[in-house]
Every structure is written in structure tokens, then in C-alpha cells.
């Protein structure tokens, strides 16, 4: 998992794990490596001691230096050798936008052709700053209420492209690990399904939590998944970050309409995998279940009662009150969607039913919607390999045509 290649180095893969062909011999991008991988690179390729790798890792992730010549406590001879066989290649910022509420969004170009781009969002709040990180260019799961799904899918992001989002944001914010923290939390909730890019995501999260990296505690790094049951089980043995599940419906019939993955991994299997995750990771005492509220779709009182029952069953299975936490998310509209946001009255009524059932339920405050940076609005720039963009455009055109005819 911590392997590296100096020449050539092709780390970009499709979902099936096949490399994308490249005729260009590349230097090793050090952002691609976690601590163990960097130590091996310094020992095996450069013939250097491990502490040299630690020096360079701190320059990269603590001081945000990408030029070896600026690493002043690294010997000149080593800097010259690093220039010859390695690089620190970070994503290029296409543009960045500021929201009136302080939210900040970056569009970052990915890959050497720069044809694809992803979005990364920073959300400041009292005493904390959360970075929402993408794991794929587009998404292959086709959830019907998500803007990213309409863009189709291109490929998985490399480890360097994932941790590079953190690097760009932290550098912009003037974040100083262990001292002046502007970036306190990372959520893998951006574009893509993180567990479909398992190895690269886990390696990137390792750097986020490493003291030589960004020094975040395990509980401050959250992975959100639509429910790939086998990969949740694998995650429980390889990482102990906080787990969030995109539930969005309290029963299989409705969830299959919203999250097609449910046809393969129904709710009973999904909940069982969450139970196993907490059983293996004793330091984690809860799973957050995300529930996007859409007007007339999943926001009725019967849905709330059904969800409360499902959450109580999870608490009972774990023998811990509060093992299930619910994050209610008002739907954030995007062009062409057929869904609407639930009314404030219905949102509060839904929450009250959960609270009365002694289920911890919070309503997520909408942030960054004026710059399309709110939950479910990220779309980036995707060279689609799935034809989904064209299908979505045809759907919109058909809908407009029917409206005109009426």
C-alpha cells in the first residue's frame, strides 16, 4: 500500500484499478506517499536515513514548501538528488470563491491534461474549521438528489490529488499544525464515493492524522459513504476514523429510488456493517447517519417515526444510547433537479419526532449555497466516461419541452 515508483510513475487509475496510460516518465510525487512510503523512498532510492524523510515531510505539510531548494536544513547534495528524481506536485487552483458566510470554495485542476477539475470547500465555524475533500472526479453511484451525480464519472483521484486539496487549503489559510489551527476537521464528503477509491483515500487520511502531516486526531477525520458494505468492513480493520453514512431514507423502497446502491446493499446489511465497524473500533462510539430532507419525498412524519425506530434498533444493537446520530440536511437545489427543499416547519417537525424518541438529531446549517458550495451542490469539471451528463441534459430538455407544451 505504500509502494512507489520513480521512473515511470503512473498512479492514476480507473475504478477497476487499471492504470491510465502515460508515455511520460515522471518523477516521484512525494505527496503520493505517507510517512512509511516516504521513509522507504529515502532509504531504498536515496540511501538516506529515515529522519531525512521526516524533515522533508514537515517542510511539505507543515510549511507548505514545494521547492526542495527552500528546504534549508536539508543538505545541498540531497536537495540536488531530490530535484533529479522527485517533486512536490500540487493541484493547480483554477479559481476560488468566497461566500458571504465565510465559506471558501476552490476549483482545482487534476492530472497533467488539466481537463478535469474537482471542488474543495472550507467551512469556518466557532472554534473549528472543516475542509470538505473530494475523492473522485465525478461519481459513479448516481444518487438522484446529488449534483455531482449529474456530471458522470471520470476516474479516482490519486493520493497526491486528495492530500493536495488539504495542502492547498491549509497553505491558503495559513494553517500551522499543533499551533495556529485554522483547519481542525476534514470530511471526506466532497465529490465521489471514498470507499470506491479505498487505498488512495486511506493513505491520504493517514497523512492527515500523522504528526508529521496535519496532526488531526482520528475523530476529526470523517469518511462519508453511500454504503459499500464490504468496504466498510475493510475500513474497520485498516482505519479508525469517524464514520458517516448517507442514508437519506428509512426504508429500502424509498432508498432504492434515491440511492441506487441500496439495491445491492439494503438497509439491514448496511446497518449491520455499521455495527461491526463500531465493534471493531472501540474508540469510536457512534455513527452519523446523514439524511437529506426533500419536500414531499422523505420528510413526512411517518418517515421520521420509521427513521427513529431504525436508529433505536441500532442503539439497542450496540447497547449504547446515542450510538446512532442523525444529521438532517436541508436539500440544496441545483440546476435541473426535480427536488425541492423541505420547509423549515417540516424540518423542525421531523427533528422533533427524532428528539422525542431520544435520538440525537441535528439540523445542518446550510453554508456556501450562494457559491454552490453547499452539501450536494459540488460538481467540478468532469470529462464524463459514463454518458450521464448527456442523459441528464436530455432529461432537462424533455422537462422544459413538456412545460412549454402545457
From Swiss-Prot:
One of its GO terms (biological process) is tRNA methylation. SUPFAM superfamilies: Radical SAM enzymes. It is found in: Cytoplasm. S-adenosyl-L-methionine binds at residues 192-193, 224, 246-248, 332. The keyword Ribosomal protein does not apply. The active site is at 119 (proton acceptor), 375 (s-methylcysteine intermediate). This is Dual-specificity RNA methyltransferase RlmN. The lineage of its organism: Bacteria, Pseudomonadati, Pseudomonadota, Gammaproteobacteria, Lysobacterales.
Amino acid at each position: 500500500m505504500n509502494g512507489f515508483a520513480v521512473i515511470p510513475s503512473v498512479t492514476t487509475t480507473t475504478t477497476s484499478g487499471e492504470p491510465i496510460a502515460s508515455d511520460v516518465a515522471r518523477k516521484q510525487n512525494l505527496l503520493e506517499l505517507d510517512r512509511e512510503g516516504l521513509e522507504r523512498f529515502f532509504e531504498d532510492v536515496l540511501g538516506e536515513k529515515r529522519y531525512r524523510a521526516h524533515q522533508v515531510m514537515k517542510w511539505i505539510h507543515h510549511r507548505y514548501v514545494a521547492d526542495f531548494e527552500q528546504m534549508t536544513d536539508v543538505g545541498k547534495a540531497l536537495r540536488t538528488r531530490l530535484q533529479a528524481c522527485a517533486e512536490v506536485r500540487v493541484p493547480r487552483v483554477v479559481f476560488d470563491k468566497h461566500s458571504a458566510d465565510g465559506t471558501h470554495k476552490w476549483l482545482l485542476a487534476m492530472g497533467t491534461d488539466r481537463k478535469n477539475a474537482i471542488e474543495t470547500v472550507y467551512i469556518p465555524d466557532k472554534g473549528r474549521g472543516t475542509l470538505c475533500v473530494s475523492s473522485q472526479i465525478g461519481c459513479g453511484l448516481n444518487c438522484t438528489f446529488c449534483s455531482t451525480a449529474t456530471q458522470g464519472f471520470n476516474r479516482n483521484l490519486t493520493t497526491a490529488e486528495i492530500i493536495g486539496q488539504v495542502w492547498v487549503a491549509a497553505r491558503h489559510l495559513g494553517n500551522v499544525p499543533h499551533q495556529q489551527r485554522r483547519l481542525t476537521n476534514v470530511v471526506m464528503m466532497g465529490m465521489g464515493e471514498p470507499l470506491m477509491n479505498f487505498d488512495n483515500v486511506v493513505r491520504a487520511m493517514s497523512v492527515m492524522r500523522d504528526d508529521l502531516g496535519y496532526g488531526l486526531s482520528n475523530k476529526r477525520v470523517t469518511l462519508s459513504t453511500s454504503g459499500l458494505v464490504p468496504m466498510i468492513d475493510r475500513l474497520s480493520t485498516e482505519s479508525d476514523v469517524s464514520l458517516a453514512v448517507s442514508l437519506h431514507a428509512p426504508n429500502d423502497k424509498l432508498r432504492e429510488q434515491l440511492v441506487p446502491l441500496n439495491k445491492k446493499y439494503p438497509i439491514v446489511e448496511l446497518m449491520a456493517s455499521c455495527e461491526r465497524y463500531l465493534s471493531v473500533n472501540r474508540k469510536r462510539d457512534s455513527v452519523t447517519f446523514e439524511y437529506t430532507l426533500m419536500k414531499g419525498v422523505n420528510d413526512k412524519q411517518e418517515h421520521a417515526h420509521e427513521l427513529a425506530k431504525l436508529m433505536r434498533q441500532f442503539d439497542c444493537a450496540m447497547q449504547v444510547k446515542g450510538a446512532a446520530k442523525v444529521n438532517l440536511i436541508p436539500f440544496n437545489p441545483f440546476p435541473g433537479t426535480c427536488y425541492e427543499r423541505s420547509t423549515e416547519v417540516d424540518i423542525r417537525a421531523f427533528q422533533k419526532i427524532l428528539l422525542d424518541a431520544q435520538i440525537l438529531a441535528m439540523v445542518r446549517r446550510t453554508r456556501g449555497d450562494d457559491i454552490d458550495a453547499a452539501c450536494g451542490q459540488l460538481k467540478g469539471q468532469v470529462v464524463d466516461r459514463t454518458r450521464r451528463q448527456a442523459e441528464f441534459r436530455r432529461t432537462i430538455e424533455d422537462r422544459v419541452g413538456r412545460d412549454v407544451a402545457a
